[in-house]
């Protein structure tokens, strides 16, 4: 986990995503209303699935989720919950392998898969990941992640609202303003 790779699995920061349909909505596809034009986010009510999909797609395109993931991964291996989980898994694996009688014809893939299943079934990963999240992610939620997300949403909605307002017609070029009348009566 500390190598910076992976992501997208259970417990991975930023691993969630939108479906293909909602990703299509975020690119300007028409909505279920059949209006034929792109979706205007400013016209959608808060909590609308299309609005959420548009916002998530915008956050992804800005790289916010990747930034959050990198921020958390840089911090994770310094936390006691991670070190504790790593030690538990190391001990579990050592104990499991000590119980195996080695012979050269052993199927290593079967052994590895059996070990993986045992680790998952033990429940230690789920509990350990929950503790890691509470030590790494939770402290960053309100002070780091939420302000960045809110700022990005406000900028996105403001840009969409600005784009939805038609520009005033341009001033006609080459015409002089009307000359003041010179009435000398």
Swiss-Prot record:
| Gly residues: compositionally biased ranges | 1-18
Q: Where is the composition biased (Pro residues)?
A: 166-185
Alphabetically ordered keywords of this record: Cell cycle, Cell division, Centromere, Chromosome, Cytoplasm, Cytoskeleton, Kinetochore, Mitosis
First and last residue of the signal peptide: none
Question: Which Pfam families does the entry mention?
Answer: COMPASS-Shg1
Q: Where is this region: Disordered?
A: 1-45, 160-185
Please verify whether the record's keywords include Signal. Answer: no
Q: Where in the cell is it found?
A: Cytoplasm, Cytoskeleton, Microtubule organizing center, Centrosome; Chromosome, Centromere, Kinetochore
Q: What would you give as a GO molecular function for this chain, any one? A: protein phosphatase 2A binding
One biological-process term from Gene Ontology?
Answer: mitotic sister chromatid cohesion, centromeric
- Per UniProt, the ranges with Low complexity bias are 19-30
Instruction: Give GO cellular component annotations, separated by semicolons.
Output: centrosome; cytoplasm; nucleoplasm; outer kinetochore; Set1C/COMPASS complex; spindle microtubule; spindle pole
Give TM segment ranges. Answer: none
Binding partners and assembly: Component of the SET1B complex composed of the catalytic subunit SETD1B, WDR5, WDR82, RBBP5, ASH2L/ASH2, CXXC1/CFP1, HCFC1, DPY30 homotrimer and BOD1.
Its family remark reads: Belongs to the BOD1 family.
**Its biological purpose:** Required for proper chromosome biorientation through the detection or correction of syntelic attachments in mitotic spindles.
Please state what the protein is called.
Biorientation of chromosomes in cell division protein 1
- Source organism per entry reads Homo sapiens (Human)
